[in-house]
Swiss-Prot record:
Residues 1-26 form the signal peptide. One of its GO terms (cellular component) is phagocytic vesicle. This is Signaling lymphocytic activation molecule. The modification Phosphotyrosine is found at Y284, Y310, Y334.
């Protein structure tokens, strides 16, 4: 092969390669519009324009794929549909539904893996049409909260740094405004921080923080003077007084409960106290006739001149102590009485 033929062959190979590359990257070179979606919700994607929908009757095959990037050569098949077979999808990925009447793809519950570039191919007898879109999912923002980072007070004026914070949300944008103001406040670099210099004329000023992303927005209002004014110590005193008042009520209730408990215990003690018995005092008295004190022989027991008298006397018994209960006892008294001689 001469040099001229070899050069012609090289030109043909280059042209064939360029043609193949242009065909392979045709979808990636399309202008794919971005469609925002709310994460976790049901989404419906319109995969074709009105002009393409009108030519759907001429199509014989529909293919929908998804790729992580527009230039990615590997795509995941989502829907494969042959129109002559009655419109029933030959293949349908789990979590999707395809509506043939308007060429829309429905995602039942969107997740992060559903993000990406969706391509739809309409094959006709002698032509092929392409359509694409980019699905971008965002988490819905939560209600913001305004916090006071720091504040200083001097000569009746107050300088304060506010921070607007959210717990959830993707690509969050912060904006500040005054509730009764016309122009929005412009923090540095559209930050979530806002620096304020307040005076007595700003007592009723209310500031609003708004957070937003492509699928949601929330706002929260705040009156900073309530945190900055010197009179802010008054509510603290009221809280202290309220706490003392409640503590006093609780103390009175506790004392009342203790008194009731003591009264109940005393009533039970009186109920079970045994019946008191009178003390019996036994007095032994001996009576003897007067006479000679000369010593006589011991008389027989039957002639004993002494007569013993037993007298039982009863006296009031003093109230004993509640505890312990003492058993009743007897006191014996011995007395000697001498009769004169007759």
């Amino acid at each position: 092969m001469d040099s001229r033929g070899f050069l012609s062959l090289r030109c043909l190979l280059v042209l064939a390669l360029a043609s193949k590359l242009s065909c392979g990257t045709g979808e990636s070179l399309m202008n794919c519009p971005e469609v925002p979606g709310k994460l976790g919700s049901s989404l419906q994607l319109s995969l074709a324009s009105e002009g393409i929908s009108k030519r759907m009757n001429k199509s014989i095959h529909i293919l929908v794929t998804r790729a992580e990037s527009p230039g990615n050569s590997i795509k995941k098949k989502i829907v494969s549909l042959d129109l002559p077979e009655g419109g029933s999808p030959r293949y349908l990925e789990n979590g999707y539904k395809f509506h043939l009447e308007n060429l829309t793809l429905r995602i039942l519950e969107s997740r992060r893996e559903n993000e990406g570039w969706y391509f739809m191919t309409l094959e006709e007898n002698f032509s092929v049409q392409h359509f694409c879109l980019q699905l971008k999912l965002y988490e819905q923002v939560s209600t913001p909260e305004i916090k006071v980072l720091n504040w200083t007070q001097e000569n009746g004026n107050c300088s304060m740094m506010l921070a607007c914070e959210v717990e959830k949300g993707d690509n969050v944008v912060y904006s500040w405004s005054e509730k009764l103001g016309i122009d929005p406040l412009i923090p540095a670099n559209s930050s979530h921080l806002l620096h304020l210099s307040l005076g007595p004329q700003h007592v009723n000023n209310v500031y609003v923080c708004t957070v937003s992303n492509p699928v949601s927005n929330r706002s929260w209002s705040f009156n900073p003077w309530s945190k900055c004014r010197p009179e802010s110590s008054v509510p603290r005193q009221w809280r202290l007084y309220a706490g003392l008042f409640l503590g006093g009520i609780v103390g009175v209730i506790l004392i009342f409960e203790v008194v009731l408990l003591l009264l109940r215990r005393r009533g039970k003690t009186n109920h079970y106290k045994p019946t008191k018995e009178e003390k019996s005092l036994t007095i032994y008295a001996q009576v003897q006739k007067s006479g000679s004190t000369q010593k006589k022989p011991d008389p027989l027991p039957a002639e004993d001149p002494c007569t013993t008298i037993y007298v039982a006397a009863t006296e009031p018994v003093p109230e004993p102590a509640p505890e312990p209960v003492q058993e009743p006892h007897s006191i014996t008294v011995y007395a000697s009485v001498t009769f004169p001689e007759s």
